[in-house]
A protein has these predicted regions:
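Alpha-helical sensor/transducer elements of the RecA-like P-loop NTPase core
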Residues: 11, 37, 85-153, 157, ...
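Conserved catalytic segments around the Walker B and adjacent sensor/switch elements
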Residues: 44-58
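P-loop NTPase Walker A phosphate-binding motif
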Residues: 28-48
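Extended alpha-helical scaffolding segments used for macromolecular assembly and cargo binding
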Residues: 275-360, 364-372
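Amphipathic alpha-helical "lid/sensor" segments that cap RecA-like P-loop NTPase cores
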Residues: 32, 38-39, 121-122, 140-192, ...
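N-terminal pre-P-loop "Q-motif" helix
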Residues: 2-15
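Conserved P-loop NTPase "ATPase switch" module shared by AAA+ and STAND
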Residues: 62-83
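C-terminal boundary/linker of central alpha/beta nucleotide-binding cores
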Residues: 149, 192-270
């Protein structure tokens, strides 16, 4: 296993600076980024005291005897203020010692003073994601070199997520070729790992909250509150920001899920939610966007939610607000998603379909809708 540990140049550079003149090295990334094994590999040969926060026997050392580096895994589980203060005191008091802290969460507020003072370096997902050279090196080490086109496909599928790449590499040991079937198998292996290592560890309200936000590429507190019906939506988003690294900023007061985690959540939603329940969530999102007069996103939600009457209503309203050929081109996919009987019930929609058919050089279809409109 150790031979497959890749130390990226940026991680090595940060580690060397930390050992030379830093005090704290903080790893902040979701599960599957190899934080623990990377830290252990970097610290090989050092006198390390390893602890895991949240364990029943967890206790900080009383002094600096018998260790040069204090390694604490799962730091987000250190929730008691006396422990937090004690760790800060150790960092301040023992300037000659080093502290390596691993967490699936963000840097907690009680440690930020060390970051602002230049005493703490942070290795986040950007520093730990693998690139083409890393992927090439991994496959070469295990004796299954791959071509550039396969590396491109692996990078596209995994976005450089270390666990995803490692699972694909493992499945290709023995000469199995890269294929869509292999990728599907690897996705399922990673998803089952996520389910056990991450998802099932959340409380039920958080799990439900995550699933109901999964269909939306980005969201704010208001959308989260509307689609989940949870009055504590803002509090839950704050908890997720602090205790996980699954949320990414997507603008002012806007969030999105880390891409691989969102894909997992959609997979989990398909398993746990009925079609009716999934449509309900999407249509709530459609209502949110409709109230914001963001008709493009509202139409997308209502279409996926199968609410044809709302799609019809918004297409008519949008055509009134934006008359002209551009409207029809932009909204074509929503017109074509409607059943013919829904279109035939609205003169405005029949006119729109006639125009769309003409734009597509489907003159027979255009004439058919024009004749239906005239009757």
């Amino acid at each position: 296993m150790a031979k497959n540990v890749l130390i990226r140049p940026l991680a090595r550079e940060q580690y060397d600076k930390f050992m030379a003149r830093g005090r704290v090295l903080f790893f902040s990334a979701p599960c599957g980024f190899g934080k623990s094994i990377l830290a252990e590999t970097l610290l090989a040969g050092q006198q390390v005291l390893s602890l895991t926060a949240g364990e029943p026997d967890f206790a900080l050392p009383a002094d600096d005897k018998d260790w040069q580096v204090l390694l604490i895994d799962d730091l987000r589980q250190m929730t008691e203020e006396p422990d937090q203060q004690a760790l800060c005191q150790l960092i301040r008091e023992y300037a000659g010692r080093r502290f390596v802290l691993l967490s699936r969460g963000a840097v907690p507020g009680w440690l930020m003073a060390f970051q602002y003072a230049g005493l703490m370096a942070v290795l986040d997902t950007n520093a730990l994601l693998w690139d083409r050279e890393d992927i090439r090196t991994l496959f070469h080490r295990q004796g299954t070199p791959v071509g550039e086109s396969v590396i491109t496909e692996i990078l596209r599928e995994t976005s450089g997520y270390p666990l995803g790449v490692a699972v694909i590499a493992h499945c290709m040991v023995g000469g199995r070729p890269y294929s869509p079937e292999l990728v599907a198998q690897c996705y399922h292996e990673v998803f089952f790992y996520f389910e056990t290592a991450v998802y099932r560890r959340f409380d039920l309200p958080i799990r439900r909250f995550l699933l109901e936000l999964a269909p939306f590429e980005s969201f704010d507190v208001e959308l989260a509150r509307m689609v989940s019906g949870d009055p504590r939506a803002g509090e839950r988003l704050g908890w997720l920001q602090q205790n996980t690294t699954m949320l990414r900023p997507a603008g002012v007061n806007q969030f999105r899920f880390w891409a691989q985690f969102r894909t997992f959540l959609l997979w989990e939603m398909d398993r746990e939610y009925s079609d009716e329940k999934r449509r309900t969530v999407l249509n709530r999102g459609g209502l949110y966007y409709e109230l914001k007069e963001d008709y493009s996103h509202a139409l997308e939600c209502y279409t996926m939610g199968g609410d044809h009457s709302k799609v019809s209503e918004l297409l008519v309203r949008n055509a009134e607000l934006h008359p002209g050929m551009g409207h029809y081109s932009e909204m074509e996919k929503y017109y074509r998603s409607l059943p013919e009987q829904e279109i035939a019930a609205s003169p405005a929609l029949m006119q729109g379909m006639s125009m769309l058919c003409a734009l597509a050089a489907d003159y027979e279809g255009s004439e058919r809708w024009y004749q239906a409109l005239s009757q």
